[in-house]
UniProtKB/Swiss-Prot annotation:
Gene3D superfamilies: Ribonuclease P, Pop5 subunit. This is Ribonuclease P protein component 2. One of its GO terms (molecular function) is ribonuclease P activity. Part of ribonuclease P, a protein complex that generates mature tRNA molecules by cleaving their 5'-ends. Belongs to the eukaryotic/archaeal RNase P protein component 2 family. Keywords: Cytoplasm, Endonuclease, Hydrolase, Nuclease, tRNA processing. The keyword tRNA processing applies. SUPFAM superfamilies: Rnp2-like. It holds the Pfam family RNase_P_Rpp14. Transmembrane segments: none annotated. The lineage of its organism: Archaea, Thermoproteota, Thermoprotei, Sulfolobales, Sulfolobaceae. Its main location: cytoplasm. It is found in: Cytoplasm. InterPro entries: Pop5/Rpp14/Rnp2-like, Rnp2-like_sf.
Length: 123
């Protein structure tokens, strides 16, 4: 139990033991529609810029998107349970990467990396 006091006011806050972990991972699977090939860091930079443009620096820090892998014009973005919705909302905002036209289409969200790999065609 945590106790905060401010002069005459006292606030009691109980920690809930069975509360779900808010840092649980989520994996967003997306399609890359483009004639060109891109590196992982180029796509990650574009995703981070679009999240920052849509939600600001706070949502960028909360969601912390990372592109894990790309395979056959499909990719996986790792994020947490708090920020996966802003990533899904910001993917269609990406129109160009390195002055080449591209469209990123979110397909599915899953909770395990193994399932995400299976959905993009690995294993």
């Amino acid at each position: 139990m945590v106790i905060f006091s401010y002069r005459t006011r006292i606030i009691y806050i109980k920690k809930i033991k069975n509360k779900r972990d808010t840092r649980a991972k989520r994996y967003v699977i997306f399609d890359i529609i483009s004639e060109d090939n891109f590196e992982i860091r180029e796509i990650e930079e574009a995703v981070r810029n679009s999240v920052k443009e849509l939600g600001g620096k706070i949502w960028l820090d909360l969601s912390n998107p990372k592109v894990i892998m790309i395979y056959n014009n499909r990719g996986i973005i790792s994020t947490n349970r708090i920020g996966y919705k802003i990533i899904i909302a910001s993917l269609p905002l990406i129109k160009k990467i390195k002055n080449k036209e591209v469209l990123l289409v979110p397909r599915r969200t899953t909770g395990s990396l193994k399932r995400a790999k299976r959905l993009i065609g690995i294993e």
